[in-house]
Amino acid sequence: MKITIAKSEKEFDCIAAWQIIGEILNKPEAVIGLSTGRTTGNLHRMVGEIYSCYPFNTSAVTFFGLDEVVNVPREYAGACYTMLKTEIIDALGIKDENFLMLPTVSDDFGKACRKNAFVEKPTPRRRRNWEG
């Protein structure tokens, strides 16, 4: 694990934004997890601002949210889905199928997560015949 210490929040935002961009440039099919909240909004917007000045290919990158609030519509301003969508996803032109988020409303969150590939489906173990 690499820990980066910055002198200010603005410097942190810049470092983190360039790390995200670097990952996309080095691995066009990268899968990147993003958190939400007051501390990450500025860096997400910074990625979008850099992209608008210096566009790069984002067609194969996939983003997923690390967290989500429940029992609110996705359109609610406090939903992590909406925060990421407005802060970075739309700015980078990410397709809906390349933006994975936990559901905000469901009668069965486990089922909804499995449907959306957030929970790895168990695969049956193969029986092997070790006789010789």
Predicted regions and their residues:
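Glycine-rich N-terminal segment of FAD-binding domains in flavoprotein oxidoreductases
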Residues: N26-C53
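N-terminal glycine-/serine-/threonine-rich phosphate-binding loop
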Residues: M1-I32
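Ligand-binding beta-strand-loop-alpha-helix segment within the catalytic cores
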Residues: F56-E131
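Short beta->alpha linker loops
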Residues: K7, R38, T104-D107
